[in-house]
């Protein structure tokens, strides 16, 4: 019964039509199985027409989520209207953020395609097995990971964006390297969004401190690296 309820919540008629569009465009063949869930979205494992593994993120047409989205979009300078258009705008904003992060040199899923409330991106995993989140798999080199992740924060900042929700839950451990995921809370870098950048930095520093790393960069050092070239 719960599975049927989930199916109806995710695969409404609009989403089903959008999946058909992705299939006809050759971006995916079919949705093979779920690999991640959240309050506003589901992520499914799939393959493209050439057999390459991909992931498909579906933003749900959920009325509860919709109530929160207008303020979310307003904070990001996006005007929208209407239920479906607002969900689509939210999805487009996330895709563009993923694209910007990826192009700036951040290790993240490769952005492949976008249609309405669907995002197609590279699959982080191997042979249908998704990479585990860093909160579940902490078998990695502390020094290398810390250097990489702080570097990712700076690269995103210099490209004009902030992840906005950076934590070990949104970092995957694949091939012993960190991959950032879920850019749905990302923001444009301005003096007004500095607190979100500060929060990301502190989340990472606090996490690595718990893991036993001592020589951490300071919040101010990261802010100087980011804003120094933005002024």
Describe each region flagged by the PLM.
Residues 2, 7, 195-196:
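Polybasic/polar functional segments that serve as interface/processing modules
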Residues 6-131, 154, 158:
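Conserved ATP-binding subdomain of kinase catalytic cores across diverse folds
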Residues 93, 148, 203:
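Charged catalytic carboxylate motif
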Residues 128-140:
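AlphaC helix of the protein kinase catalytic domain
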Residues 141-152:
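Conserved alphaE helix
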Residues 145, 157-163, 174-231:
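C-lobe/activation-segment region of protein kinase-like
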Residues 165, 169-171:
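Catalytic-loop signature of eukaryotic-like protein kinases
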């Amino acid at each position: 019964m719960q599975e049927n309820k989930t199916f109806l919540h995710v695969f409404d008629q609009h989403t089903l039509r959008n999946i058909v569009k992705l299939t006809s465009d050759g971006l995916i063949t079919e949705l093979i199985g779920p690999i991640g869930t959240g309050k506003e979205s589901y992520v499914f494992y799939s393959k493209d027409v050439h057999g390459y593994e991909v992931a498909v993120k579906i933003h749900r047409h959920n009325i509860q989520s919709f109530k929160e989205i207008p303020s979310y979009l307003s904070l990001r300078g996006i005007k929208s209207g209407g239920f479906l258009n607002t969900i689509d705008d939210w999805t487009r904003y996330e895709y563009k953020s993923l694209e910007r992060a990826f192009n700036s040199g951040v290790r993240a899923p490769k952005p492949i395609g976008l249609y309405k409330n669907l995002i197609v991106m590279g699959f982080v995993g191997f042979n249908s097995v998704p990479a585990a989140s860093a909160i579940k798999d902490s078998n990695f080199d502390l020094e290398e990971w810390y250097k990489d992740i702080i570097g990712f924060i700076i690269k995103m900042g210099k490209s004009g964006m902030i992840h906005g929700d950076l934590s070990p839950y949104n970092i995957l451990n694949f091939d012993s390297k960190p991959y950032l995921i879920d850019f749905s809370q990302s923001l444009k870098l301005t003096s007004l969004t500095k607190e979100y950048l500060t929060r990301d930095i502190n989340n990472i520093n606090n996490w690595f401190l718990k893991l036993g790393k001592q020589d951490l960069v300071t919040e101010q050092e990261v802010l100087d690296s980011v804003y120094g070239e933005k002024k």
